[in-house]
């Protein structure tokens, strides 16, 4: 039986989602609970592997079990055993061929920035502080340039190992908030550190050090040395996982380009 679990977590005290040889991770917390319940190791499969310090409003993982436990009981048992910085929002059964990673057709991230005369210690780890004056309109114009299908080689970590760095962005915008701004970006998928590099670049645009019309050339050049800065992880939130094309179409229209991942478990 395959179980799908929806969770949220604050990433401050985690070394990321994926299990590490040493250190606290989200995967480690759940696999420890499942091992205790099953009396053997049970691997979980996430929709996304967030990095150290990154938060999630919505994240999914699935696992296989032989235990006959009601979904509400799964939720109760996990939440009772979990630390306060992780919460199980929902548990449900899925088809045996469903796979969290391969059936994920899109993700939305939100990056939070606050501004002011000084840092707020109560926002430490959850939002990023920028004290310079920023031109939000100019930043939003630059953000719009990223919408569409592009090769984002120049806007990701040089450690990125995937073969294709082509991704499609359906949404890329600056949203003004009471104390600063949020950068909201939705796409077919994201490369290592891609959102944080985009944010760092947009902040440079806001400071007047870059221009919106720099974007097409930077995308074409595919050179990370031309976009050297990376924003800290503190303000980054995985906000939504799209597990069906219908969800994406409902929000962004029927003409969008959807990238389907081949599920290895179906073959």
UniProtKB/Swiss-Prot annotation:
Active site positions, chain numbering: 51 (nucleophile)
Residues engaged in binding substrate: 109
BP GO terms, sorted: tRNA pseudouridine synthesis
Subunit structure: Homodimer.
Species of the source: Staphylococcus epidermidis (strain ATCC 12228 / FDA PCI 1200)
Keyword list, A-Z: Isomerase, tRNA processing
Record Gene3D superfamilies: Pseudouridine synthase I, catalytic domain, C-terminal subdomain (3.30.70.660), Pseudouridine synthase I, catalytic domain, N-terminal subdomain (3.30.70.580)
Enzyme class (EC, first level): isomerase
Catalyses which reaction(s): uridine(38/39/40) in tRNA = pseudouridine(38/39/40) in tRNA
Similarity remark: Belongs to the tRNA pseudouridine synthase TruA family.
InterPro entries associated with the record: PsdUridine_synth_cat_dom_sf, PsdUridine_synth_TruA, PsdUridine_synth_TruA_a/b_dom, PsdUridine_synth_TruA_C, TruA/RsuA/RluB/E/F_N
Record has Ribosomal protein as a keyword: no
Molecular function terms, GO-annotated: RNA binding; tRNA pseudouridine(38-40) synthase activity
Record function comment: Formation of pseudouridine at positions 38, 39 and 40 in the anticodon stem and loop of transfer RNAs.
Highest taxon listed in the record's lineage: Bacteria
EC number, as in UniProt: 5.4.99.12
Gene that encodes it: truA
Name of the protein this chain belongs to: tRNA pseudouridine synthase A
